[in-house]
From Swiss-Prot:
Its main location: cytoplasm. SUPFAM superfamilies: Chaperone J-domain, HSP40/DnaJ peptide-binding domain. It is found in: Cytoplasm, Nucleoid. GO terms for biological process: chaperone cofactor-dependent protein refolding; protein refolding. This is Curved DNA-binding protein. Gene3D superfamilies: DnaJ domain (1.10.287.110), Single helix bin (1.20.5.460), Urease metallochaperone UreE, N-terminal domain (2.60.260.20). GO terms for molecular function: bent DNA binding; unfolded protein binding. GO terms for cellular component: cytoplasm; nucleoid. Keywords: Chaperone, Cytoplasm, DNA-binding. DNA-binding protein that preferentially recognizes a curved DNA sequence. It is probably a functional analog of DnaJ; displays overlapping activities with DnaJ, but functions under different conditions, probably acting as a molecular chaperone in an adaptive response to environmental stresses other than heat shock. Lacks autonomous chaperone activity; binds native substrates and targets them for recognition by DnaK. Its activity is inhibited by the binding of CbpM. Residues 5-69 form the J domain. CDD domains: DnaJ, DnaJ_C.
Amino acid sequence: MELKDYYAIMGVKPTDDLKTIKTAYRRLARKYHPDVSKEPDAEARFKEVAEAWEVLSDEQRRAEYDQMWQHRNDPQFSRQFQHGDGQSFNAEDFDDIFSSIFGQHARQSHQRPATRGHDIEIEVAVFLEETLTEHKRTISYNLPVYNAFGMIEQEIPKTLKVKIPAGVGNGQRIRLKGQGTPGENGGPNGDLWLVIHIAPHPLFDIVGQDLEIVVPVSPWEAALGAKVTVPTLKESILLTIPPGSQAGQRLRVKGKGLVSKKQTGDLYAVLKIVMPPKPDENTAALWQQLADAQSSFEPRKDWGKA
């Protein structure tokens, strides 16, 4: 097993300070990141750079490595790197040598376990109309690159084309496996989670799987009954207003709410009685005739009663 020249890998000198090495690491990590670089050996180079940074960014491990590198050409050191028959050592032999020179801490540091990458969570805005059918969406997000200390060194822009299934609800989470940050030492990538946010609609309010819409009607439409055109998510329908309807009354339109795999909600039309503008003399006379005809009607009769 070859003792790697971590300084050469990073393109720095052994005398360079941590700030210089950190700058080199950021530049190389961006250059060779598998999601950005088009070079065939990008993944291998990226891991090599990460390995070098993991050692050189730690003061104690860097000192141990420098000592090992300094004695790499010593006869005693060279003899330890070969068997008596001249054959190269294996990984187990290297671990024994590594441990004998720097102690158990170095061996434990060398044998770092595979670590799963971090998950990423982003919010995706979806219009109500888009929930009716499956649709494709291009999303962009930043992929964090972590250093050996678990701190974010940089963020690399990434773009994906994804499918948003029909019937998604507000707050629903969609998992895209392996689209999070890369794992370390052969560990699996993290996942990308899309958190659905249903954008506010100018007409409809969401109540579970149902929708509510406020329908303005005139006093005479409420009193006499009428048929009015009401929009739904798919098309407009003709809604029947029963005679004697009241303000705030809810009229149910079955099957015109949100659609999911389990159920289809309903649409509720909430009536809002809208008065005409200030009446002229003739209109005021008609309102007075109505008031005289309904003089026994007391709208506040049960006001305040349970």
